[in-house]
Amino acid sequence: MQMNRLDQAFAALADPTRRGIVVHLARGEASVSDLVGLFSLTQPTISSHLKVLESSGLISRSRVAQSRPCKLETQQLKAVTDWLERVQELWEGNFKRLDALLAELKQAQKEERKK
């Protein structure tokens, strides 16, 4: 995934309403009117949030008669998750090295006290 796309996804997810929309869409498709009722926001406000989510690739909207159901795009969400997991692995590696260093220092202190 290009970094620009990742940046767009994180920017989209920075807003609590958009995160709420993503959580709701994880349960299944929803129309704009469904989301308006759920979040007690105006239709233009919800549409604005959906536009940001759609441009980031996190959701897609189709046209069914007069409705435009929204659905979560799991591929883009997986790319975000994969990036976070890589960062988590780096941090866990740092913590493991720190734990090993602390264990070494404790052992050295014990040996020093015995002298």
Task: Please give the residue ranges for each predicted region.
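Pre-recognition alpha-helix immediately N-terminal to the DNA-recognition helix
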Residues: 19-21
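Short, Lys/Arg-rich nucleic-acid/phosphate-binding segment
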Residues: 47, 63-69
